[in-house]
């Protein structure tokens, strides 16, 4: 058997250990996970009710076109139903775009570091990667423009960016979009858009009317609290959606994910409460960092990337022993930084107290700048 050469040696995705495994291995009664940017307040109670009702229909294939959800999302974002494509998480929409546009003769442009799935899917399709380093944690749009050529097919803008939490302003994004060739796809990945508070964040969805090469990605995994159900979507002009729709696998969104997403959209109060609590938690973390003299990237998301000035792996392991799962920055391109998801006030209090203890200890590691 001959596998694609670019897949040989490609490491599989390695999820973090389940909390139950961590409890057992370290002898802990409780473990708090603040590593994957999930909603610490869960999902709307209406979601559980919708799933309970859907249990009566497990023998029937889901609606392959997600009609009810499609209409609900179309109203939510202000587009026509035909301007949407749904995926098993926005990860799958990324995969669909890469399958549709990339091959061995093409290249794709992205920031470095940014969300890992752009790179992974491009490698699988055999495309050349053109990674442009961030400037002060923010996309270098001018640098990205410079590396676009006749073989470029997709440019990725993670906005706000993961792992830094920083964002590209409306003025900068629109100027960038106007300069990208019309035959190059621009993907604005907005997984954290509901958390954004910046007044000058771009309103990208209306831009699909002007820019036929723009795709906007959104997800239900973050503020809506549906990470376990895997549902996301892309927004683009109808002609583009029609071109990529054949690449989408059939029945890729389960009945449960569809009814859950509809229910989540209907509970605006839950979303608003989650956003308000996140804002309070973000203020709690940033004020703590300032008191501790720790640098961080100003974030428009539900996580904060913090400079701890030492091996992030060591800090991660020390925090794990105290019952807190955070994210080491080593795999994210920041070996002396850690990423912490904003939790509830109680979770934040405990995590910050544990982190203060860890940073006060003499870690037998080489300090990194």
Swiss-Prot record:
It catalyses: L-histidinol phosphate + 2-oxoglutarate = 3-(imidazol-4-yl)-2-oxopropyl phosphate + L-glutamate. GO terms for biological process: L-histidine biosynthetic process. Transmembrane segments: none annotated. InterPro entries: Aminotransferase_I/II_large (IPR004839), HisP_aminotrans (IPR005861), HistidinolP_aminotransfase (IPR050106), PyrdxlP-dep_Trfase (IPR015424), PyrdxlP-dep_Trfase_major (IPR015421), PyrdxlP-dep_Trfase_small (IPR015422). Pathway: Amino-acid biosynthesis; L-histidine biosynthesis; L-histidine from 5-phospho-alpha-D-ribose 1-diphosphate: step 7/9. Its cofactor is pyridoxal 5'-phosphate. Keywords: Amino-acid biosynthesis, Aminotransferase, Histidine biosynthesis, Pyridoxal phosphate, Transferase. The modification N6-(pyridoxal phosphate)lysine is found at residue 222. Its EC number is 2.6.1.9. Coiled coil: none annotated. The keyword Repeat does not apply. The keyword Hydrolase does not apply. CDD domains: AAT_like (cd00609). One of its GO terms (molecular function) is histidinol-phosphate transaminase activity. PANTHER family: HISTIDINOL-PHOSPHATE AMINOTRANSFERASE, HISTIDINOL-PHOSPHATE AMINOTRANSFERASE 2. Homodimer. Belongs to the class-II pyridoxal-phosphate-dependent aminotransferase family. Histidinol-phosphate aminotransferase subfamily. NCBIfam families: hisC. This is Histidinol-phosphate aminotransferase.
């Amino acid at each position: 058997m001959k596998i694609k050469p670019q897949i040989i040696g490609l490491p599989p995705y390695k999820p973090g250990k389940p909390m139950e495994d961590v409890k057992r291995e370290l002898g802990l009664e409780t473990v708090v996970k603040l590593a994957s940017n999930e909603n610490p307040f869960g999902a709307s109670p209406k979601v559980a009710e919708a799933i309970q009702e859907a249990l009566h229909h497990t023998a029937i294939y889901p609606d392959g076109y997600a009609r009810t959800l499609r209409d609900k999302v179309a109203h939510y974002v202000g587009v026509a139903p035909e301007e949407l494509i749904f995926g098993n998480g926005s990860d799958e929409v990324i995969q669909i775009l890469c399958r549709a546009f990339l091959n061995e003769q093409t290249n794709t442009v992205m920031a470095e570091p940014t969300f890992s799935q752009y790179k992974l899917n491009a490698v699988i399709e055999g495309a050349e990667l053109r990674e442009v380093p961030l400037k002060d944690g923010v996309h270098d749009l001018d640098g990205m423009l410079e590396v676009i050529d006749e073989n470029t097919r997709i440019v990725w803008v993670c906005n706000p960016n993961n792992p830094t939490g920083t964002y590209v302003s409306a003025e900068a994004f629109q100027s960038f979009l106007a300069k990208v060739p019309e035959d190059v796809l621009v993907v604005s990945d907005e997984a954290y858009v509901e958390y954004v508070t910046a007044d000058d964040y771009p309103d990208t969805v209306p831009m699909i009317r002007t820019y036929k090469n723009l795709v906007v990605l959104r997800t239900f995994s973050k503020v809506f609290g549906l990470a376990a159900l895997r549902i996301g979507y892309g927004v683009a002009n109808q002609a583009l959606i029609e071109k990529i729709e054949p690449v989408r696998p059939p029945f890729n969104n389960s009945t449960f994910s569809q009814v859950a997403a509809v229910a989540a959209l209907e509970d605006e109060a839950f979303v608003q409460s989650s956003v308000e609590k996140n804002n309070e938690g973000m203020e709690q973390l940033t004020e703590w960092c300032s008191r501790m003299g720790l640098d961080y990237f100003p974030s428009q998301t539900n996580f904060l990337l913090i400079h701890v000035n030492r091996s992030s792996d060591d800090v991660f392991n020390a925090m794990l022993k105290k019952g807190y799962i955070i994210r080491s920055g080593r795999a994210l391109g920041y070996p002396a930084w850690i990423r912490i998801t904003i939790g509830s006030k109680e979770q934040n209090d405990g995590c910050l107290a544990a982190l203060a203890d860890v940073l006060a200890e003499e870690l037998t590691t080489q300090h990194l700048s």
